[in-house]
């Protein structure tokens, strides 16, 4: 309790004990000293907190600097935006078309989710098409765009090399394709028997879902072989992995960069992807062990599993994780692109039934000349009308809007003096090239036999095929960077379509015309909600 004494009060009470007066004054002085000490402690404490916060902020900045990709210098070209800001590859065709028309023959850039992409004019294609991976790299581009470290999109995510799978496709799959046509045909017939109902009358089907499972069966026959390729758990695993990976990528990207590692534990799609890898490891373990033993004895099956082991380095060969992921990644690529390409072709045929009979006649005429139980590698290229129809369908409904995507690894000087700096992403405008009025007559009009007529011109026999690549044919890339699996995919697609066209009539439910495709990050996808009616043909 504070006591205040006035001088008048002290003067009027001459007998007051002086000790009683001094004690409260000492207490007051002590309290003031304590308050002063406490104030100094609090000030020092706040300084420590500020210092700690500064250190923590500095540590976070250092950590971000370590994980953040190095940004190349800004490319000196117009950058396109939509009404809401930088575009993110959703509903992108209009924006790319604007850039292609306004800057034709020049550079422009797109601000994508993974960074800036420089869109190159086709005049630079020839000088880039043969450059090696240590100058412009596909693996790095894919890993950044699809966040492979977290999504398991590529084999690099588990310590493997994409080149191992590429070598298996180039050196084994493509070269032995002629010996595999019987297996492909057998699996197409089996898959239709298992997955397509009798269709004695018009039957409504979710055709895209059916095709995903048909392609999974046919591809699995070549990738892992019987009996595993028909194992339901294996089929569910590769299909679920394919779907979950593409859904997972944008969800992972929504995480702060420093926290993306947590998506493995917090995100249901990412957890599902890792679960698929664990399932594939379990399913493939005995097959891989058995295949290794056969290869050591100089034998072994003719499938992608064996070829991947054969082309692996020691680290990859010894890793069940890497071998399992190779199986998933290869299956994903096949299921995703092949099923959508076949679906688009079916939609185009259902919308234009006048093409069905000429395609059937071509197949029947060939079968009369070459009475084989199935189309082989030499007879398949003779279906020129079917080849043309597929190419036209792919021209107007591409899987991707951009192609020949790469990341620059070393400085590249183009013939006009422009330097592409390391870290830059590049691409060519596939869809706009395929619809360029300077290249194609009536490009917006569907002409199923457009490319057959072009091939009939002198000197064009080997040009304009479905699998052909070139400056104006970028569906499968070009040069050393062309898709290595396009020959297998083309034969698989044609085998499925021939079986469907030969055995079924089909149409849309109602007079709806050709359904619009859906825009998704990077390209056109056929609308999965569209249903098709099938009816089995009565053949003599």
Swiss-Prot record:
Q: Which GO terms describe its molecular function?
A: heme binding; iron ion binding; monooxygenase activity; oxidoreductase activity, acting on paired donors, with incorporation or reduction of molecular oxygen
The signal sequence is none
Specify where it is mainly localized.
membrane
Q: Which gene encodes it?
A: prx8
Residues carrying a glycan: 460
InterPro entries, per the entry: Cyt_P450, Cyt_P450_CS, Cyt_P450_E_grp-IV, Cyt_P450_sf
- Matching PANTHER family: CYTOCHROME P450, CYTOCHROME P450 MONOOXYGENASE AN1598-RELATED
What is the protein's given name?
Cytochrome P450 monooxygenase prx8
Protein location: Membrane
Q: Where does heme bind?
A: 483
Looking up Gene3D superfamilies in the UniProt record yields: Cytochrome P450
What EC numbers are recorded for this enzyme?
A: 1.-.-.-
In its UniProt record, which GO terms are filed under biological process? mycotoxin biosynthetic process
Q: Which cofactor does it need?
A: heme
